[in-house]
Every structure is written in structure tokens, then in C-alpha cells.
């Protein structure tokens, strides 16, 4: 009977805890100004998680992830200004808007909505020291 309880506990952890581990468990990160050798090359970025400004005290953040040395394991993660990331993708998608597929048009609309949700009032109400820019190595 004890083995069944342990098995159920492991299953519950697998179902409910592991999917939220990593970026989703702690979506708010510190934006750090990095030296050039520590930046992620654009072609190496595998995932980008955008975090709404309502989630992180008025700050729009993004987590840029890359596998290390071609492995499937996500090792390298960088925090970025979410508004800059969203603006970059909006700019790229608008340049070729006539050739966009339905999914890319939907992405453009979603990004524009996210960008439009940012307000100066959110920034003034934010704890400016919480996600401050840090000079990193």
C-alpha cells in the first residue's frame, strides 16, 4: 500500500510541478547588460517567453533560451526587455505583412496587443529597483 502512495505522489509531482519548473515557475527575471561574448546569437535562440507587464510589477520582460553546444537540453537563458523583443518582432512581421501566413498574422496581432497593453501608469507604479538593469559579466 505504501508503494502505491509513493507512486501516486511521484505521478502528481510529474503532472503538476515539473511542467511549471524553469521559466514558468519564476517568470520575472533581472535584465542584465552583458558583454558581447555572453550574448546569445539570434540564430541560436530556441525559445522566447514573453511575460506581460501585469505579471512583473509593470515591467515587460522576455526570457531568451538557447541549447548549449547543440544539445537538446536548455541550458542558456537570458532575460531581456520584453518591449524591445516585441517591438523587434512587430517590425519584422510588418515588413512582410503581405506575405504572412494566417499563423503569422495572428502572432502579429497578439504581439501588437501585448505591446499596446503597456502603459506609463504601470511603469510609474512599478518597483523600479526590483528588476533593475544590472551590469553583468
Curated annotation (Swiss-Prot):
Disulfide bonds: 28-56, 29-79
A biological process term (GO) from this entry: fusion of virus membrane with host plasma membrane
Annotated signal sequence range: 1-22
InterPro entries xref list: Herpes_gL_rhadinovirus, Herpes_gL_rhadinovirus_sf, HSV_GL_alphagamma
Region (Interaction with gH): 23-128
Principal cellular location given in the protein's record: virion
A Gene Ontology cellular-component term: host cell Golgi apparatus
Keywords: Disulfide bond, Fusion of virus membrane with host cell membrane, Fusion of virus membrane with host membrane, Glycoprotein, Host cell membrane, Host Golgi apparatus, Host membrane, Membrane, Signal, Viral envelope protein, Viral penetration into host cytoplasm, Virion, Virus entry into host cell
Membrane-related topology note: Peripheral membrane protein
Keyword Phosphoprotein: no
Subcellular location: Virion membrane; Host cell membrane; Host Golgi apparatus, Host trans-Golgi network
Keyword flag Transport: no
Domain of life where this protein originates: Viruses
Assigned protein family: Belongs to the herpesviridae glycoprotein L family.
Role according to the record: The heterodimer glycoprotein H-glycoprotein L is required for the fusion of viral and plasma membranes leading to virus entry into the host cell. Acts as a functional inhibitor of gH and maintains gH in an inhibited form. Upon binding to host integrins, gL dissociates from gH leading to activation of the viral fusion glycoproteins gB and gH. Fusion of EBV with B-lymphocytes requires the additional receptor-binding protein gp42, which forms a complex with gH/gL. The heterodimer gH/gL targets also host EPHA2 to promote viral entry.
Known partners and oligomeric status: Interacts with glycoprotein H (gH); this interaction is necessary for the correct processing and cell surface expression of gH. The heterodimer gH/gL seems to interact with gB trimers during fusion. The heterodimer gH/gL interacts with host EPHA2 to facilitate virus internalization and fusion.
Name recorded for this polypeptide: Envelope glycoprotein L
Organism: Epstein-Barr virus (strain B95-8)
Gene name as annotated: gL
